[in-house]
Amino acid sequence: MKIDGNTFICRFNVAILDDGYYLPMDKYLFVYHDQLEYIGQLNPNIIDQAYAALNEEQIEEYNELTTQNGKVNYLLAYDAKVFRKGGVSQHTVYTITPEIASDVNEFVFDIEITLPQEKSGVIATSAHWLHKQGHKASFESRSFLFKAIFNITKLLHIKRSKTILFTSDSRPNLSGNFKYVYDELLRQKVDFDYDIKTVFKENITDRRKWRDKFRLPYLLGKADYIFVDDFHPLIYTVRFRPSQEIIQVWHAVGAFKTVGFSRTGKKGGPFIDSLNHRSYTKAYVSSETDIPFYAEAFGIREENVVPTGVPRTDVLFDEAYATQIKQEMEDELPIIKGKKVILFAPTFRGNGHGTAHYPFFKIDFERLARYCEKHNAVVLFKMHPFVKNRLNISREHRQYFIDVSDHREVNDILFVTDLLISDYSSLIYEYAVFKKPMIFYAFDLEDYITTRDFYEPFESFVPGKIVQSFDALMDALDNEDYEVEKVVPFLDKHFKYQDGRSSERLVKDLFRR
């Protein structure tokens, strides 16, 4: 490698990079180690030169591309190196393509390998077929049993059973919106008239407890009121009695990232004939502005979306609780006493629970630590529960950083937070209640819009400064450039009520009390 100022020229042999073997298929960053780590960036001159070499037809193709990364990658593709076996093979090919990786918005080498598909033997093919058929038969038998229990129970409870059910496939206990609704049911003495039941599962990929395999369909068929707070696939496979209320108290506040039918046509989104979400008879939201978005997302009528406020935000308006929790948080996290507290709480990257991660290399921890030292600050990292790759805080940084990802209730952390750094997390709604500054570190904004998208334009919607590089993030911190004037209008738009009585309104609306 040769380095001249801010430019470098690098030459390497892909055939021996992986401990004497060829570099396997993946995307690779360029990282230069010199006490600190520096991520290699693409020289803009290369792009200018590549564009200048295009002919008229290529310029037309280039102009048809809608994203900046797409345009850059179109130009970089001409520098791809393709190695074919024997020089002509179509089946054994090793390709190295320079590109801007859209998921992290960084310059990488994308290596792809094409190899001839091995023919499976008769025994292996038969074993695979039998395994697949066995899995299918198991699923069908479990589905039949579930629906049979549900339908029998439903027939036995044509009249009201005086039962309320809280159920989730992504929550281990009575927490979040469920907890506040439950407490309000007790306060209004609804439990005097109804038997309250719960069936939970920690996440959607876990196996259900053996007992709950029977309890869930039984209670779904019996209950008069069924509360859910997330995607719950089993309830979409059955047909409820007309008298049953299926109530969605969605776990996130506001309408930020698209969900449900708003993602039709995108990866992971349902198709228009899907039964997902359509079972809900009521959905409760924070403001009238959310109504059309949630109706679209769930495939339900707008009159079934009710803006009573979100139950778990009630605590944010409770001054007595604020005093109590601040003291509890200082006792639990003594590192924050007398410090400026920055909460770094991004959402996950990936397509869902199984692939969720966060690219920690997008954070220059040494530089952030120096900021903390200079400004008497600490950073609390609260990663999304789905994120599999854990944050590794070095010994020398432990006086500045702490990982609070295992702290279940993020709302408690907000009470001691002076500045929020996030990206596309709906946590911004709750934090807006405190009328404090936010920075949006959206390094992959273009890709996120393409793959996930938002209900409103991100740039004009979010209540704070948007930065798309770590340098810009540090500049905003150093200059206290937060665009905090956006917070109060955002709060007033998305919180119809700011009185801490959302749970009360919801229960009164359902039970006419």
From Swiss-Prot:
InterPro entries registered for this protein in UniProt: Glycerophosphate_synth, TagF_C, TagF_N, Teichoic_Acid_Biosynth
GO cellular component: plasma membrane
Record carries keyword Transferase: yes
Catalyzed reaction equations: 4-O-[di(2R)-glycerylphospho]-N-acetyl-beta-D-mannosaminyl-(1->4)-N-acetyl-alpha-D-glucosaminyl di-trans,octa-cis-undecaprenyl diphosphate + n CDP-L-ribitol = 4-O-[(D-ribitylphospho)(n)-di{(2R)-glycerylphospho}]-N-acetyl-beta-D-mannosaminyl-(1->4)-N-acetyl-alpha-D-glucosaminyl di-trans,octa-cis-undecaprenyl diphosphate + n CMP + n H(+)
GO biological process: cell wall organization; teichoic acid biosynthetic process
Pathway membership: Cell wall biogenesis; poly(ribitol phosphate) teichoic acid biosynthesis
Keyword Membrane on entry: yes
Cellular compartments annotated: Cell membrane
One Pfam match: Glyphos_transf
Membrane-spanning parts: none
Membrane topology field: Peripheral membrane protein
Keywords: Cell membrane, Cell wall biogenesis/degradation, Membrane, Teichoic acid biosynthesis, Transferase
Enzyme class label: transferase
Subcellular location, principal: membrane
Molecular function terms, GO-annotated: CDP-glycerol glycerophosphotransferase activity; CDP-ribitol ribitolphosphotransferase activity
Documented EC number(s): 2.7.8.14
PANTHER family: TEICHOIC ACID GLYCEROL-PHOSPHATE PRIMASE (PTHR37316), TEICHOIC ACID RIBITOL-PHOSPHATE POLYMERASE TARK (PTHR37316:SF2)
Family: Belongs to the CDP-glycerol glycerophosphotransferase family.
Function: Can catalyze the polymerization of the main chain of the major teichoic acid by sequential transfer of ribitol phosphate units from CDP-ribitol to the second glycerol phosphate attached to the disaccharide linkage unit.
UniProt-recorded name of the protein: Teichoic acid ribitol-phosphate polymerase TarK
Species lineage: Bacteria, Bacillati, Bacillota, Bacilli, Bacillales
